[in-house]
A protein has these predicted regions:
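Positively charged n-region of N-terminal signal peptides that target proteins for export
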Residues: 1-9
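Bacterial N-terminal signal peptides
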Residues: 9-21
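Accessory carbohydrate-recognition regions in carbohydrate-active enzymes
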Residues: 25-263
Length: 263
């Protein structure tokens, strides 16, 4: 055995021993990059995927949303703004989605419209795994994290020191409903948005429970904000809740949904 062969083998063994602790602490799922295949658009398909956060055979998936409401290409890698964090059931952009709705944290002024609430983000400040997603929203100085179960999800929003911190709930257009219940730190609603293939009475009912009392409430109908109401139904309904937050304060939201009822 020559000297170079011995050196090579020793180097290989040292490399293996160096990485063994890293490999031992990781599950196979940690090696999945859910951003692969997201550099797609209508004109050119290069994967047609989105970074789904989901359990195997889960009823719902969740994803950051860079596309417009109803756009089958809900997340594209080359986009630079996030407009919401959406519950989705989309198998393919060509088939589109059904029952979708979204949450979005913002700071500063009260807004609802998807482009007004959108925030710049960077892939350098983004973690995308099948079971967990995290991103920093630069315009609002808010970090959003989410994880899921088979039928529910958990959000954690880390806010800056801000008198005007908000979470927007967008039930999307083509028929939706929102009711804010301040005494229970709760928002309920439904989305009927779909691309066909559902029953005539289709609704995706959802309940969102927060762990901090609301200091501000408003609803929106077709992007018009109404501060004197806590319930709205129409083509495009939404809700806005507000808080005063200190630097680094974390607000959690638990989200559950059903195709049957609020119960």
């Amino acid at each position: 055995m020559n000297k170079f062969s011995v050196i090579f083998k020793l180097s290989f063994i040292n490399t293996i021993f160096f990485y063994l602790p890293v490999l031992a602490n990781n599950s196979p799922v940690d090696y999945v990059n859910t951003l692969v295949g997201t550099q797609s658009k209508f004109e050119l398909s290069t994967g047609n995927t989105y970074p789904a956060i989901a359990m195997p055979w889960g009823m719902n998936f969740w994803t950051p949303q860079t596309g417009d409401m109803g756009d089958g290409w809900t997340y594209t890698y080359n986009a630079d703004k996030i407009k919401g964090f959406k519950q989705t059931h989309q198998p393919s952009p060509w088939m589109n989605d059904y029952g979708q709705f979204a949450l979005m944290p913002v700071t500063g002024g009260v807004v609802f419209e998807q482009n007004q609430r959108a925030s710049w983000f960077s892939h350098k400040a983004e973690i995308a795994k099948p079971y967990y997603y995290k991103v920093y929203l630069a315009d609002h100085d808010v970090t959003t994290e989410m994880t899921v179960t088979e039928r529910a999800s958990l959000f954690r929003f880390t806010f800056p020191e801000e008198q005007n911190s908000y979470v927007i709930v967008d039930a999307f257009d083509k028929g939706s409903y929102i009711k804010i219940i301040p005494e229970e730190n709760k928002i309920i609603g439904y989305s009927t948005r779909n691309s066909g293939g559902v029953p005539e009475n289709f609704k995706n009912y959802f309940i969102i429970v927060f762990d901090k009392p609301f200091q501000f409430t408003a609803v929106a109908l077709d992007n018009a904000i109404k501060t004197n109401q806590t319930e709205i139904e129409g083509n495009h309904a939404g809700g806005i809740i507000g808080f005063s937050t200190h630097k680094g304060e974390q607000i959690h939201a638990r989200v559950a949904s059903s195709f049957i009822s609020f119960e």
